[in-house]
Regions:
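Conserved P-loop small GTPase signature centered on TRAFAC-class small GTPases
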Residues: 1-24, 28-33, 51-58, 112-204
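Post-Walker A helix-loop "phosphate-sensing" segment adjacent to the P-loop in P-loop NTPases
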Residues: 32-40
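Switch II (G3) loop of P-loop NTPases
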Residues: 59-76
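Generic enzyme active-site microenvironment
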Residues: 63, 89, 123
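Conserved Walker B
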Residues: 67, 92-93, 127
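Short, solvent-exposed loop/turn segments at secondary-structure junctions
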Residues: 70, 96, 130-131
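Inter-motif core of Ras-like GTPase G domains
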Residues: 72-95, 101, 111
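Generic structural signal for well-ordered alpha-helices
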Residues: 102-106
Length: 204
């Protein structure tokens, strides 16, 4: 594998969502760790570093796990800063976790601002619990279409490779977003897009 790092190195990816939706296990299985059957809900944020090679360049990415309990929401907004990819997770057997997705999507927008600067996605986790499904897949897909973001149905227990593939697609989307010149070029383009305020005409 090439040791040359690409522009946009150290890509911060954050998983948001209610407690118990499986964010920790999604990170575990996508980083080669074991699925924890009796996983305890996270009460703090942590991250794992991984890498991806794309177009002969090596990109480092950090997967951030966050606590979903309401008492930690203000902290999660702090951890959102600097994120380049935001993944909002709900569990298909937990309708309240789906209903809270708007909060998480809006939190990202509040902290990160212009949606052209980062990649967003919705992940429906625990597809293995189809017999207990409380949120039809089409509802998740419709919400993703509403916000013009990607959508994935997966299971940390049964579909580790599927989620990892989706994760890599998001990373490649971000790499293509910033282009060969990196984040500075992206920021320049965004500045160009903002219309200049018309100068007031002065009359003598």
């Amino acid at each position: 594998m090439s040791e040359k790092s690409g522009n946009g190195n150290n890509i911060k990816i954050i998983l948001l969502g209610e407690s118990g939706v499986g964010k920790t296990n999604l990170i575990n299985v996508s980083t080669g760790r074991n699925f924890e059957q009796n996983s305890i809900s996270s009460n703090q944020s942590s991250f794992f570093e991984e890498s991806l090679e794309y177009n002969n360049k090596k990109y480092i990415y950090n997967l951030w796990d966050t606590a979903g309990q309401e008492i930690y929401r203000s902290l999660n907004k702090i951890f959102l800063k600097g994120s380049k990819i935001v993944i909002c997770v709900y569990a298909i057997d937990n309708r309240p976790s789906f209903q809270e997705l708007e909060y998480w999507i809006n939190s990202a927008k509040e902290i990160l601002g212009d949606e052209d600067q980062y990649i967003r996605a919705i992940v429906a986790n625990k597809s293995d619990l189809f017999e207990e499904q409380a949120v039809p897949d089409n509802e998740g897909r419709q919400l993703a279409e509403k916000h013009k973001i990607k959508f994935c149905v997966t299971s940390a227990l049964c579909d580790a490779e599927g989620f990892k593939k989706f994760l890599h697609e998001l990373i490649i989307d971000y790499i293509n977003l910033i282009g060969p010149e990196g984040e500075n070029a992206l920021n320049f383009k965004l500045c160009e897009k903002k219309p200049e305020k018309e100068k007031k005409k002065k009359f003598c």
